[in-house]
Amino acid sequence: LSKKQFEEYAGVTVENFPEDILSWYDEKGNLRQNWVPGKHAKEWIEWRATVIHDFVEKAHAALKEINPDLIIGDYTGAWYPTYWQLGVNWASKDYDPYQVPEYQAWATEDYHKTGYAEMLDIYMTGLYYSMITKDDVDKATGVVGQRSEAGMDNSLTYCYSVEGGAEIAKEITKGVVPVIGSIYVEQYLGDFTPFGPAVTQALKSTD
């Protein structure tokens, strides 16, 4: 069903599925450590985000018809540079990742149209990071901390800190929705020392 709907959306015929989208196996049938994008990968990424956008749009319209004063909110992780892997574009439609050179590996020219922040009254962003400030990232020396959530990678970039994650969340939502920082309490089991500073930073850096 996904293949058929994607072909209708993109106006293409996927001759080799799923290899033309992505593949986990090499030519000899051996499992790769990381998946490899196929020739239609970027269009597939756009289509997946469109499915979620259209669902949010329909749900928003239906709920507001029942109660115009209803507050509609959403949660996602704050790691936007890799969150496209989950098929979700929680940014403002006016934020265009295609204009960011390092995002052009996955973003199409129309990807920004899948953003749905404008349809939210409140947005909670998951700041599930061991590092709290951007300065912590600079001092990390190869230690990435706990990263067990879907879509995360092991890069030492500012978005993988409470401060940096909040910063990018506010940047890409363009002020169209209040951004509330969310902290994962269980992440601090065994050592609650960073918990207070993490909460303080989240309160400072978000709305």
Positions of the model-derived regions?
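Active-site mouth loops of central-metabolism enzymes
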Residues: 186-193
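Polysaccharide-binding and catalytic clefts of secreted carbohydrate-active enzymes
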Residues: 1-163, 168
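Proline-centered loop/turn at the N-terminus of a beta-strand
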Residues: 69-71, 176-180
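Carbohydrate-binding surfaces of carbohydrate-active enzymes
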Residues: 184, 197-207
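Generic structural signal for hydrophobic
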Residues: 115, 169, 201-205
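Charged helix-capping and loop-helix junction motifs
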Residues: 161, 194-197
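Conserved beta-strand segments of the P-loop GTPase G domain that flank and frequently precede/overlap
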Residues: 126, 182-184
